[in-house]
Curated annotation (Swiss-Prot):
Region annotation Disordered: where it falls in the sequence: 139-174
Gene3D superfamilies in alphabetical order: Immunoglobulins
Protein name according to UniProt: CMRF-35-like molecule 4
UniProt gene name: Cd300c2
Positions on the Cytoplasmic side per record topology: 209-228
Biased composition (Polar residues): 154-170
SMART domains in the record: IG
Membrane topology: Single-pass type I membrane protein
């Protein structure tokens, strides 16, 4: 059976271990690297953890954080593309990622391994770090874009030199409305002519109907009027 004092103290210790101000590890909360490049992060610890093992794990929960690389001395330790080195002189240890990939983006923790009989009930110390990875610019693609930009700029400059000729070319479409205005004028005059012809025809018909009639039996020069 656990003594009452321990039962009261244990939850308090667990609570204090979760308070940010009580965590004896410090470092950047977020780091960002580019694909294909290397990225280093340093975590600082307290003097009392100078001789303890340090490790780097992947995961957002302490109990499920998967160890990636661990060191027990100042010698560099490598696991694939990840290295860790302890610097006891300045109380820091550095984790370096080489040739970053987009799959490396995740939540990580820098941690100090605490033994069960070390006065801290064996609770390891953790500090959470978010790693973001962004795509990198391909130098070849960049040079290709520069070449393409130069190629595009060359015709632009030549067009600028030949601007007067381009201006004259732009004035060539100006006469295009002339046939349209000519057709409009032609339609107008045809319409006027038709109306004039119709008017003259009607006038001629009226004059023809109202012309003076001449008697057939009399003088040809004397008109013949009805109802004399």
């Amino acid at each position: 059976m656990i003594p009452r004092v321990i039962r009261l103290w244990l939850p308090s210790a667990l609570f204090l271990s979760q308070v940010p101000g009580c965590v004896p590890l410090h470092g950047p909360s977020t780091i960002t690297g580019a694909v294909g490049e290397s990225l280093s992060v340093s975590c600082q610890y307290e003097e009392k953890f100078k001789t303890k093992d340090k490790f780097w794990c992947r995961g957002s929960l302490k109990v499920l954080c998967k160890d990636i690389v661990k060191t027990s001395s100042s010698e560099e330790v490598r696991n694939g593309r990840v290295t860790i080195r302890d610097h006891p002189d300045n109380l820091t240890f550095t984790v370096t990622y080489e040739s970053l990939t987009l799959e490396d983006a995740d939540t990580y923790m820098c941690a100090v391994d605490i033994s069960l009989f070390d006065g801290s009930l064996g609770f390891d110390k953790y500090f959470k770090i978010e790693l973001s990875v962004v795509p990198s610019e391909d130098p070849v693609t960049g040079s290709s874009l520069e070449s393409g930009r130069d190629i595009l700029e060359s015709p632009t400059s030549s067009v600028g030199h030949t601007h007067p000729s381009v201006t004259t070319d732009d004035t060539i479409p100006a006469p295009c409305p002339q046939p349209r205005s000519l057709r409009s004028s032609l339609y107008f005059w045809v319409l006027v002519s038709l109306k004039l012809f119709l008017f003259l025809s009607m006038l001629g018909a009226v004059l023809w109907v109202n012309r003076p009639q001449r008697c057939s039996g009399g003088s040809s020069s004397r008109p013949c009027y009805e109802n004399q």
